Amino acid sequence: MEEKRSTNSPGFDKPKLNRSGSITSATSHPPRSNSNPKLVAKHQQQLYEESKNKRNQEQQNQQPQQQQQKQTSNQSEDPATQLSSLKFESDKEKEQALLWAFLASYLPEDKGSLQKEFVKHVEYTLAQTKSECTDFSSFQALSYCTRDRLIERWKDTKLFFKQKNVKQVNYMSLEFLLGRSLQNSLSALGLVGKYSDALMDLGFKLEDLYDEERDAGLGNGGLGRLAACFMDSLATCNFPGYGYGLRYKFGMFYQTLVDGEQVELPDYWLNYGSPWEIERLDVSYPINFYGKVSEVEDENGKKVMKWDQGEQMLAVAYDYPIPGFKTYNTVAIRLWSSKPSDEFNLDSFNRGDYLGAIEEKEKSENITNVLYPNDNTMQGKELRLKQQYLFVSATIQDIISQFKETGKPFSEFHNFHAIQLNDTHPTLGIPELMRILIDEEKKSWDEAWDITTKTFSYTNHTVLPEALEKWSVSMVENVLPRHIMIIYEINERFLKLVDQKWPGDMSKRRALSIIDESDGKFIRMAFLAIVGSHTINGVAYLHSELVKHDVFPLFYEIWPNKFQNKTNGVTPRRWIQQSNPQLAELITRSLNSDRWLVNLDIIKDLVHLADNSSFQKEWMEIKRNNKIRLAKYIEKRCDIQVNVDVLFDVQVKRFHEYKRQLLNVLSVINRYLDIKEGKKVAPRVVIFGGKAAPGYYMAKLIIKLINSVADVVNNDPKVGDLLKVVFIPNYCVSNAEIIIPASDISQHISTAGTEASGTSNMKFSMNGGLIIGTLDGANIEIRDAIGHENMYIFGARSEEVNKVKKIIHDGKFTPDTRWARVLTAIKEDTFGPHEQFQDIINSVSGGNDHYILSYDFGSYLDIQNSIDQDFKDRAKWAKKSIMASVCCGKFSSDRTIKEYAQQIWGIEEWKRPGPVPVSNEEARSLLVPPPSGSPNDINAISIERLSPLTFVKQTSASPLSVISGGDKTNNTLKPKQTTKGFNIGGQPGNPTN
């Protein structure tokens, strides 16, 4: 076989095949074989001379090129070679400079680079071949690619905040209901289109990979989803902050239905790992339990308290980066996982007690296994207490560790850190900070208390007395002996203040004491949070008023300035842009801008289109498309077919008696009875979803009733499409993104004065789903924003509820006749043996109707009839739907976070400049090795990661001043100004929008 010659060798043209398959020269052709031999020889000589001359000419042409390449090669010396010409004070300084040089470049975003990174993660991170690569492994690879970019931004954000000595908020929450992260992260990074195109060439559809992700099992209900929205807004609004929580191995539980009853299964969300988390084995803290406290003398002869712990374990950090939208700022949630302090008890093992050694390890890890362990037993209660303490202790230790890096005295702690308690679960953080300041940092009580009360603030989320958390004094004394002493001291000093205000008033003293002694001894955690915090806030206007005047009125008398309102909000990036992309596109097109995603108030500019028939038509087409998507999901999950042209009526939320899912299902029974009697009704699909706490018997019984009603209704041939009842199991963020955009009506029907705020009402309204509800929580403010005519309000008002309860209890109230009919249907075994539902019947009969369902039932059915009539008028309904959406700008979590930042935390917006585009030539002058390409290729480099050591030595100027063009020195290595509009100065108060 003829040897293949290099096509790049001088003097040779690229060969090509002739028709017969033989190789010929690309320049000329020899004569045919029957030609004159002399002519052939002459021709060969001619070819030789041509080839020789051409080779000589190419060699001459290449000499300048080789010289240029040599010069370029000298310019592109690796950083180590370049650094050798600079003077350093030590080898360590030089090594640091070299490390910084390699860290400065950002990952490129061109199509080829995206594909290369994706394939690299498939091959090296997942160790898979092409034949092994499934949609799930492709999701993992893409997630790792995305995480790489989040880490770049997060590292630089941390460096930027550190350089600026900013104050940050530390948001402590036992729940972060994040949902899926891939789509949200790509959208925030602006890479959806680029990755969609890059993956299409590789045979993958981006939307299919989204569906491979499992929801993170880090929360349960509204509390956790609010925390997730807040983290999104912290990053988007450029506020310095950290979220702190726990890394649950099994989440709360995976809900399934067996014979209509809720069955809890472990939520194995971490079975295949999480591509988003960053395990921080370098960040761990010892956590201590039990033991005893004794008074000893320190080295100075001072009496101090010493806690000899009986059990120790470790809290190990896992970080989840949270990107901001249309900003380079990225924050993180730090989650703690419990580990044994020694991985294995070798002593026990060597004594032959292998099972004991294993048991000790598992006992440590159990603490963060499950969200909210069932506390119906003493063991469950103790596990929950240990879980909360591990959470707060690790968090406080971590915050203090960060603060010590500033080198500032502890008197300035509150100038660098604010701590927000999301409900009472993290309240043990108050005595924990006191313990560390007094016992470890040797501060006096007054110094420690001053620092603590300037640092903490507390958000209350409930007005229900039974929901206000309490801990048994004896249990805390056993598990946390040092902390019970501190809590007693806090209480004693606080009660002196009470005595000063109300001398000799023992009833006030008992009512305000942190220690409740009315029935045993319990620590009232909300009281501890109020006493130890500088600010207390409710989460809706009505709720905050109830907190001040009904729930904590005496505290409000003492500290009226401590109490504020911060109405909740939700992020429009997830709850419109991600969950309802067609609606987002319509809004953007109609506004000719997508700025509404970071300034939701401007969608009100669309109010004038509410009467526009073509806009209404497009709006309702989008709604119908979302209903089609939900109908497919229902058929797949529940095996029920529904008509998308009828009204979709939705109630999805955590199950609790005060939320009154029971009122809803009783109205469904009434509608079913109307159909059976031949009355004309508007067709409707009624959709339920939500979990009941494992130990909440009544909530689980209501779920059973709903499914029993659904079983009868959906299988009755006389009913057909007039009524369908659907219970969607395992309600979570990802299926909420399908359910919420499809609703025509959503139900928020809690007894007035019991719901703190609610956030699902905001999500439904933003997506054009009309609300039927009581004047409770945020419903009131939504009504004020969108107009009473665009909501369906019924029921007693909060100020009437106590009077209503009394007349029901006294037997002086006669319910609507339809109420008796519905209860009779249950008693007559219409939906199965009535005995199984007897406790439900008892809970709303005989003066026991605590949540006044019987009182509100009549007005509830009447407003449902109004909905049926309005839904028939398509233009009227479309206008209501549009108004419900475009007037909801107030309910963005961005607004809420800005209010917290300005009025509670005292933090400022710090928008980091982001990477700066520079050419390869400029990158070399900054001692940054460019990835590849010609001197004029553009790369993105990090200002924060440019070495302050090498750059100052190289240019006698700071990286910031040179890149921003601020350096006026005559330095030949100064790159051109290539900031392209980025805010290099990084001053506070530069909002994204």
Curated annotation (Swiss-Prot):
Residues 1-82, 962-993 are annotated as: Disordered. It is an enzyme of class 2 (transferase). Its EC number is 2.4.1.1. PROSITE patterns: PHOSPHORYLASE (PS00102). It comes from the Eukaryota. The record marks 242 as: May be involved in allosteric control. Residues 58-77 have a biased composition (Low complexity). InterPro entries: Glycg_phsphrylas, Glyco_trans_35, Pyridoxal_P_attach_site. Its cofactor is pyridoxal 5'-phosphate. It catalyses: [(1->4)-alpha-D-glucosyl](n) + phosphate = [(1->4)-alpha-D-glucosyl](n-1) + alpha-D-glucose 1-phosphate. GO terms for cellular component: cytoplasm. The modification N6-(pyridoxal phosphate)lysine is found at residue 763. Residues 19-48, 962-981 have a biased composition (Polar residues). Keywords: Allosteric enzyme, Carbohydrate metabolism, Glycogen metabolism, Glycosyltransferase, Pyridoxal phosphate, Transferase. The record marks 229 as: Involved in the association of subunits. The keyword RNA-binding does not apply. Pfam families: Phosphorylase (PF00343). GO terms for molecular function: glycogen phosphorylase activity; identical protein binding; pyridoxal phosphate binding. NCBIfam families: P_ylase. Phosphorylase is an important allosteric enzyme in carbohydrate metabolism. Enzymes from different sources differ in their regulatory mechanisms and in their natural substrates. However, all known phosphorylases share catalytic and structural properties. In D.discoideum glycogen phosphorylase exists as 2 developmentally regulated forms, GP1 and GP2, which are the products of separate genes. Homodimer. Belongs to the glycogen phosphorylase family. This is Glycogen phosphorylase 2. It comes from Dictyostelium discoideum (Social amoeba).
